[in-house]
Design a protein with these regions (language model features):
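Cysteine-centric segments in proteins
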Residues: 1-81
């Protein structure tokens, strides 16, 4: 699975980068209407970097998988045409 970097705005309360609220992809801004699913990867394995995944639906009805890399504090999405 290939990912592309994104600019993401998040809901930050007691800690940073909790949930995505909007993101910009290829110059277009998308607003997250609903978080359909979330999961974590790499937290139990000290040899892997912790990653947070969010499957989201936008206001336009499109579905995206967003990923937050905790170490680099960067967001990306599954690359699709």
């Amino acid at each position: 699975m290939e990912f592309v970097r994104l600019e993401v705005s998040t809901r930050d309360e007691y800690k940073g980068a909790q949930e995505p609220v909007s993101f910009v992809r290829r110059g277009k801004e998308y607003h997250v209407e609903q978080i359909l699913d979330r999961w974590y990867e790499g937290r139990m394995d000290s040899t892997r970097m912790p990653l947070l995944y969010f499957r989201v639906r936008t206001h336009s009805g499109e579905i995206f998988i967003l990923r937050y890399h905790e170490f680099f504090r960067s967001w990306s999405a599954v690359a699709r045409d």
